């Protein structure tokens, strides 16, 4: 979420923010479906596996989690008469508001009409989240004195990740269909960018879908994609954690990314070919333009 905070800061303060360069790792600029799972059922790749009523209550009362709601074109597939806009309260299951109402009833300073208070509070959290995300989407780097080459944007790929959310109506209630088949990984490491079409964007780091990690203030050609296979030979513990806990949480530990960040902030050359990355799906050959100059394209053999 740090990348979202940095983008919000730059939008608010512009060139007064005194920022020269930024690096963001697996930031859900367009959201993550794991935030929906955490709010809806109390589980997901943003935390532990076993859902609990206490965890659901905490998630539903946490404003920051609503800032991670996904807004990816075509990814929320709503049934007839239902909204696909998850920043609208009507798109959500009623029990979310009911949980907030119970919290107000037990812990509110004025526990009068808790359901009405809960509806206002839920709508307010969604509206604030939508407004913030809108400001991030409309960020203009030049207003902050920056160029695309000043922002290193790293996205994790080649891990099964939830890339869509079907919504259906059931007995007058909204129902989120949380299906394992909606976790996909169509990334193909054997195909170079010339053959890697946008469909291979149906991947991610296990938590953030690739399409959720591409900010609107940068182009796809500016994104650096990394995979779990980029862990070094001796990063044995990190490889184990990747399999056990997912790529998203362990991605910042990758030695190669540390070297990449140092190169970005210092402008130092790569004398030994120790930093690399991959172009994003849909980027034509020769158009990859990452922030770090002369970054080795891992897709190009030899």
Task: Provide a role label for each language-model segment.
Residues 1-2:
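Gly/Ala-rich beta-loop-alpha elbow adjacent to hydrolase catalytic centers
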Residues 5-9:
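Hydrolases whose catalytic domains are alpha/beta-hydrolase-1, hotdog thioesterase
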Residues 11-302:
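Helical cap/lid subdomain of alpha/beta-hydrolase-fold lipid enzymes
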């Amino acid at each position: 979420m740090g990348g979202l905070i940095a983008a919000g800061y730059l939008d608010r303060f512009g060139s007064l923010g005194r920022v020269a360069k930024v690096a963001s790792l697996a930031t859900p600029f367009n959201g993550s479906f794991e935030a929906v799972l955490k709010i809806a059922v109390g589980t997901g790749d943003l935390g532990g596996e076993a859902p609990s009523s206490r965890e659901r209550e905490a998630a539903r009362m946490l404003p920051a989690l609503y800032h991670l709601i996904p807004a990816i074109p075509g990814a929320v597939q709503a049934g007839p008469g239902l909204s696909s806009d998850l920043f609208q309260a009507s798109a959500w299951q009623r029990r979310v508001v009911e949980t907030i109402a119970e919290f107000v009833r037990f812990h509110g300073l004025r526990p009068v009409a808790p359901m009405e208070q809960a509806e206002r509070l839920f709508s307010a959290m969604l509206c604030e989240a939508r407004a913030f995300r809108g400001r991030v989407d409309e960020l203009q780097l030049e207003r902050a004195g920056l160029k695309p080459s000043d922002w290193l944007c790293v996205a994790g790929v080649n891990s099964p990740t939830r890339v869509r959310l079907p919504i259906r109506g059931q007995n007058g209630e909204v129902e989120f269909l949380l299906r394992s088949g909606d976790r996909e990984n169509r990334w193909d490491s054997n195909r170079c960018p010339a053959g890697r079409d946008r469909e291979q964007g149906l991947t991610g780091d296990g938590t953030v879908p690739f399409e959720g990690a591409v900010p609107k203030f940068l182009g796809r050609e500016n994104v650096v994609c990394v995979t779990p296979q980029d862990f070094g030979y001796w990063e044995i513990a990190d490889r184990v954690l990747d399999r056990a806990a997912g790529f998203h949480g362990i991605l910042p530990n990758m030695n190669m990314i540390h070297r990449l960040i140092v190169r970005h902030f210092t402008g130092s050359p790569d004398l030994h070919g120790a930093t690399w990355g991959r172009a994003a799906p849909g980027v034509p050959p020769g158009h990859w333009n990452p922030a770090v100059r002369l970054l080795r394209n891992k897709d190009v053999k030899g």
